Amino acid sequence: LNISFSLIFWYNYSIKDLEVFMLDFSTMIYRIPALLFAITIHEYAHAQCADSMGDPTPRHMGRLTFNPMAHLDLMGAFLLVLVGFGWAKPVAINQNNFRNRKEGIIKDSLAGPAANLFACFLAAFMAALLNKFGMMGDGMYKFLLWMQLYNVWFAFFNLLPIPPLDGSKLVSEM
């Protein structure tokens, strides 16, 4: 398999396939699970990283979980599905608890976007594999396409150096 950045949007990709402005049930059945996964993996990665760097705050606040409800801001998720812009519930961290404050902030800021990029490439790999063996149905195609889109969008958007996004924390520690 040839895995490259172009694989992110694999065979016969077109904006029509994404049905970006379609808000009917047949579109939401693929978009909502992909969105919940992207939000959950992003925020869980922040929580896990902070915990591993010495900050128990996310664990104490119940954020060290794959349960999407712990990470979901209902209004932010609703707007993300509806208009393409929204937010999740940010993971609270106490930078003073990090064993190495600067390293902790940098690693924690990169954890969410890195998890999203990994999920994006995993979805692309799964799509290529399923397609190669002729096991790609229309539903799986749409779901994996939305998984890639939401995850790559979350990763790059969160790296913008605009407070309170992860990119602004990176810039402040450089």
Regions flagged by a language model, labelled:
Residues 2-174:
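Hydrophobic transmembrane alpha-helices and their immediate loop junctions
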